[in-house]
């Protein structure tokens, strides 16, 4: 663990903050690269990224604080200290999507821009998990000798600094996000329905996050024994799955009839 990236003469830069910046830069470059390939104006995408980043980070932090209220009710001074780590991907996705859509809808189709942002979001989330690993947030449950997956254990601290063999939850999350980014990037040249990549990303990542929730050791709100973040993952997965099915069932647009001039030319 290395929560402090750089420190000099009272100035401290956290590793989590560095990972956030790197994730934003890498995700932006990935989305812009795909936008150029599709001949979409870069300024349009950058405006959406800016709106998504601002609303997404605010929503993600608020969501994380609410989910982990058991900790923050006794550490209220840390709520605004974003650089210490702690973002909810579910709240960030909702807030970021709303921000991007509000900007992108001025030049429809808005979902086309969200498709581009999904590629960058996957890469950005990967850096976010690395930041969580370095800052000991979203840590894994303890593992004990004799348990089936003890061979995966790493010595890692929890939010209170207690180091024990734990699930490598943050590293698994980073690997899953990176895998999704590679899948979206390598298939970017195929023909996609507008909105398909966005919903596919949400479905795939929320499924992985739901499964990963069983390995997390941070104390969060629960409902009927289920972690609140897993409940949100399940809701996002269901929503994305319904959207994908609707896209699949949507009839392709009928071919347009030839223009009158073209029809006359063909008859002559």
Q: Which ranges hold each PLM region?
A:
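A feature for loop-to-transmembrane-helix boundaries and adjacent hydrophobic helices
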Residues: 1-268
């Amino acid at each position: 663990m290395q929560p402090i990236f750089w420190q000099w003469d009272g100035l401290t830069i956290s590793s989590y903050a560095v990972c956030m910046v790197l994730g934003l830069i890498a995700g932006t470059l990935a989305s812009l690269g795909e936008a150029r390939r599709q001949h979409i104006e870069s300024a349009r995408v950058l405006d959406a990224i800016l709106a998504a980043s601002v609303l997404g980070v605010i929503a993600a932090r608020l969501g994380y604080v609410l989910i982990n209220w058991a900790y923050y009710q006794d550490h209220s001074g840390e709520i605004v200290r974003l650089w210490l780590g702690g973002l909810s991907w579910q709240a960030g996705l909702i807030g970021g999507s709303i921000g991007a859509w509000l900007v992108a809808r001025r030049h429809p189709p808005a979902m086309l821009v969200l498709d581009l942002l999904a590629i960058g979001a996957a890469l950005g989330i990967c850096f976010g998990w690395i930041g969580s690993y370095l800052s000991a947030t979203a840590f894994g449950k303890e593992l004990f000798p004799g348990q089936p997956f003890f061979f995966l254990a790493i010595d890692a601290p929890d939010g209170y600094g207690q180091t024990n063999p734990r699930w490598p939850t943050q590293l698994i999350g980073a690997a899953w996000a990176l895998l999704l980014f590679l899948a979206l990037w390598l298939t970017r040249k195929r023909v996609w329905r507008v909105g398909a990549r966005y919903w596919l990303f949400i479905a795939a990542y929320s499924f992985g996050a739901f499964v990963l929730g069983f390995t997390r050791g941070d104390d969060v709100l629960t409902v009927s024994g289920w972690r609140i973040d897993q409940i949100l993952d399940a809701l996002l997965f269901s929503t994305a799955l319904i959207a994908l099915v609707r896209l699949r069932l949507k009839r392709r647009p009928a071919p347009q009839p030839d223009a009158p001039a073209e029809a006359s030319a063909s008859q002559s």
